[in-house]
Amino acid sequence: MLFFDTFGTVVSWRTCVAEELNAAALDAVNHAHKDLPADLRDRAAAMTWDDWLAFVADWRQTYNGFTRSFDPSNEFVSVDQHHYNALQDLLRQRGLDGLFTDDKLWELAFAWHRLNPWPDSVQGLELLNRLFDTSTLSNGNVSLLQDLQRLGSLPFKHLVSAENFGAYKPSPLVYNGAAKKFGLEPSQCALVAAHLHDLKAAKSCGFQTIYVDREQEEEMSKEQAAMAKAEGWVDMWVDLESDGFREVARRFGI
């Protein structure tokens, strides 16, 4: 069975989220909230496209920190809730607190439900479905994955979220829970991901691993990635110049 990381592996997040933030800020400055303080209006108006891209990258980093540090013994906090909380913090840090209404903040937090698939994702999944059961294995909550599947026409046979196990990757509870959910041994499962740290954690649980390099997704340096490759974290390596999921299907003879 093939499990897929989702953010960055199946869908591209950077531009999609930046577009929503940029549009919302322009609307707030030019059309809504006519009573915005002048200094807030000026700071928002001064935000460039590159500024919003950097904002989104920082938002993504808060997600990484949140999921990696989450203690499964605590009450579960959804990714949606984290995105909302982190958005408020990031706006405050930039002097943009008060730019958006609470309803708008939640709408923007849900921008992560509206991400576009990479160009090879849909067709690649269709091909892989001929030979394998396919499922998400994402830290995104269930409703988020349902929206991504619906809006992106992603042909997964199953949707599995870390939410199902009250933990977040890289906790072993998620990988082991996913295998157990389908009555499989970990060795009967493979994780497809664009992040080597995710694959290392899956490999330590007994999963097979498939690395699909995506633009601007890998956090490790080239030297660290080469070391990970040499140490056997990855069973199938699809580089950036290849054709993503379609290349995975080709290597399986599909």
How would you name each of these model-derived features?
Residues V17-A25, V56-Y63, H83, L105-W112, ...:
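Hydrophobic alpha-helical core bundles mediating ligand binding, dimerization, or RNAP-core interactions
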Residues L26-T48, E223-A228:
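Intrinsically disordered, low-complexity domain-flanking/linker segments in eukaryotic proteins
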Residues V122, E126, L137-I254:
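Asp-based, Mg2+/Mn2+-dependent phosphohydrolase catalytic module
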Residues V29, R41-W106:
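A metal-dependent, Asp-based hydrolase signature
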Residues M1-A18:
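Asp-based phosphoryl-transfer active-site loop
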Residues F76-Y84, D97-T136:
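Short, acidic loop-to-helix structural element flanking the phosphoryl-transfer center
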Residues T62, R130-L131, A162:
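Structured helix-beta-strand junction loops
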